[in-house]
């Protein structure tokens, strides 16, 4: 989540010993926010197509539900069925914190017999949000080069690199992608709205 192109370029030296890397470019779906762009990855659909097939998603968006990405596994299963891949065995795992990542690493061999392992990793997105809120992170990530270095240093010491090394040893093909990136704001703008307006910073709806 939130991994930019320059972040990926920064971590390539850590991945090159493990994999033959093929780099392909894509654009994020608009609006570049997780409820839309990541759901598009798992469903293979544009937002208007999604709300037609999944009406509950439309109602969740209108009600500003706390999580608009809770059905990612179901979306992915449906997309596999669309491509007549019903027999593909799947393990889906969303990781928010280091403890969860360590638990996944310790159990990764249990999932090795699955045809498809899907990981959602939120560290880079959390770093993007928290680096503007916490003074200690403002010191550690003062600019774009610091941001890239922080992402590389995290991966180098993380459970995820250990998991990728295991995948490499097992001969797995790995696809690493991102739902959106981030931009460091230099000139912020105050948006006036009533209390029914959405609270997100990437896009707004309401009055």
Whereabouts are the PLM-identified features?
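Feature captures the catalytic ectodomains and active-site-proximal regions of enzymes
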Residues: 2-207
């Amino acid at each position: 989540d939130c991994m930019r192109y320059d972040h990926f370029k920064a971590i390539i030296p850590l991945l090159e010993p493990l994999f033959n890397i093929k780099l392909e470019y894509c654009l994020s779906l608009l609006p570049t926010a997780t409820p839309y762009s990541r759901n598009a990855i798992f469903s293979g659909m544009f937002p208007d197509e999604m709300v037609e097939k999944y009406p509950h998603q439309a109602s969740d968006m209108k009600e500003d539900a706390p999580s608009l990405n809770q059905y990612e596994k179901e979306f992915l299963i449906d997309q596999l069925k669309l491509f007549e891949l019903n027999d593909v065995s799947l393990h889906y795992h969303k990781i928010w914190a280091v403890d969860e990542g360590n638990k996944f690493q310790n159990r990764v061999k249990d999932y090795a017999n699955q045809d498809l392992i899907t990981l959602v990793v939120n560290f880079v997105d959390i770093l993007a949000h928290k680096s503007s809120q916490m003074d200690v992170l403002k010191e550690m990530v003062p600019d774009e080069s610091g941001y890239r270095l922080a992402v590389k240093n995290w991966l180098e010491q993380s459970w995820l690199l250990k998991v990728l090394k295991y995948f490499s040893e097992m001969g797995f093909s790995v696809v690493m992608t991102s739902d959106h990136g981030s931009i460091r704001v230099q000139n912020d703008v105050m948006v006036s709205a009533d209390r029914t307006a959405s609270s997100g910073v990437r896009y707004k709806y309401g009055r």
